[in-house]
Design a protein with these regions (language model features):
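Short, small-residue-biased leader/transition segments that mark boundaries at the very start
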Residues: 1-5
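Conserved functional hotspots at enzyme active or ligand-binding sites that engage polyanionic ligands
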Residues: 6-118
Length: 118
């Protein structure tokens, strides 16, 4: 099926420089669906299961097992990346509307659109 905003995929983020999240890990697709359909690249945020709890306002913790992502996984919206679609592997699942509301707010914080976070 077609890739959509709010889907998660495994992606190969190697090679890594410095503090970037790396390896083969899940990422959340954040690019709009027109871009997902036509662009050779995609905007994504890495997901980690090793953090335990969110540490920054740009972190969103999944409070349930979300279609293949483990409960307690944290989406790192301060580490947005534009990656080539060839880095994507299999689809993991999709987030629901309430989770996407949290994502939207944290994304606003990350890019300076949220009130008080410029």
């Amino acid at each position: 099926s077609e890739m959509c905003i709010r889907d998660s995929y495994y992606a190969d983020l190697r090679p890594v420089i410095g503090s970037e999240q790396g390896g083969i890990r899940p990422v959340l697709i954040l690019q709009n669906n027109v871009g997902n359909r036509h662009s050779p690249t995609v905007i994504a945020a890495p997901i980690t299961s090793k953090m335990g709890k969110p540490r920054l306002p740009t972190h969103v913790c999944l409070n349930r097992q979300a279609n293949g992502l483990s409960c307690g996984s944290v989406i790192l919206l301060e580490q947005l990346r534009t990656i080539d679609k060839s880095r994507l592997r299999e689809r993991v699942g999709a987030l629901d509307t309430s989770e996407m509301k949290q994502i939207d707010w944290a994304l606003g914080v990350s890019v300076g659109l949220a009130e008080g976070y410029r």
